[in-house]
């Protein structure tokens, strides 16, 4: 199994130096990173971070940076519902890619505060899954996939302003977009090349 090295940073707190992992340091600036496949463990971590930041300051913006190929629908929807549950604005940023559930989470940010860097790529498609078991099991799982397909299309329609029928049609196959195309589609609001281009003036303190 490939191990990912998590960098540590050292800060001078006035009472000596303190080391912390990079994600904890970013959390101090209300920055949450989704930088891998969206799994249940990742979703639980992201949700805990979001709820912690809400408890610290229920009015101050939270920044969510996304570089993800997508992942499990239930995990992604758990993060989506949490974003909508928060009382504060959530600024979403696509860096690299936001595919599948990653694209849905990108679009779920506060309208006017959904961003992508210039060379980012976004992709939407219909849900898929390996179906095994008895014929009755296969029927049930196929019906669930169709239900999720309509459910996700409704969410994307609400977030982007596109008709549900267009979302369903475009999602039949992998539907890729560049940053400018994503603006036209309604996934994001602005392409930014610098933190100064956003409405959030304190992206990193």
From Swiss-Prot:
Compartments, as annotated in UniProt: Cytoplasm
CC terms in the record's Gene Ontology section: cytoplasm; endopeptidase Clp complex
Catalytic residue list: 100, 125
Top-rank EC class of the record's enzyme: hydrolase
Gene3D superfamilies: 2-enoyl-CoA Hydratase, Chain A, domain 1
Gene Ontology BP, a term: protein quality control for misfolded or incompletely synthesized proteins
Record's signal peptide: none
GO molecular function: ATP-dependent peptidase activity; ATPase binding; serine-type endopeptidase activity
Listed EC numbers: 3.4.21.92
Keywords: Cytoplasm, Hydrolase, Protease, Serine protease
Subunit note: Fourteen ClpP subunits assemble into 2 heptameric rings which stack back to back to give a disk-like structure with a central cavity, resembling the structure of eukaryotic proteasomes.
Family membership noted in the UniProt record: Belongs to the peptidase S14 family.
Protein name as catalogued: ATP-dependent Clp protease proteolytic subunit 2
């Amino acid at each position: 199994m490939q191990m990912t090295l998590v960098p540590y940073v050292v800060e001078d707190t006035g009472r000596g130096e303190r080391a912390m992992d990079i994600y904890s340091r970013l959390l101090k600036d209300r920055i949450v990173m989704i930088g891998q496949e969206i799994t249940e463990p990742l979703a639980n971590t992201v949700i805990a971070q979001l709820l912690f930041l809400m408890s610290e300051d229920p009015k101050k913006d939270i920044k969510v940076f996304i570089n993800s190929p997508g992942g499990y629908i239930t995990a992604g929807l758990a993060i989506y519902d949490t974003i909508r549950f928060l009382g504060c604005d959530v600024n979403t940023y696509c860096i690299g890619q936001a595919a599948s559930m990653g694209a849905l989470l990108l679009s779920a940010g506060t309208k006017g505060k959904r961003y992508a860097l210039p060379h980012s790529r976004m992709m939407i498609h219909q849900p898929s899954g390996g179906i095994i078991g008895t014929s009755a099991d296969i029927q049930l799982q196929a019906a669930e996939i169709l239900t999720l397909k309509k459910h996700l299309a409704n969410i994307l329609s609400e977030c982007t302003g596109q008709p549900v029928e267009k979302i369903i049609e475009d999602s039949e196959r992998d539907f890729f977009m560049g940053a400018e195309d994503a603006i036209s589609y309604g996934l994001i609001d602005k392409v930014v090349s610098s933190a100064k281009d956003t409405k959030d003036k304190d992206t990193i303190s």
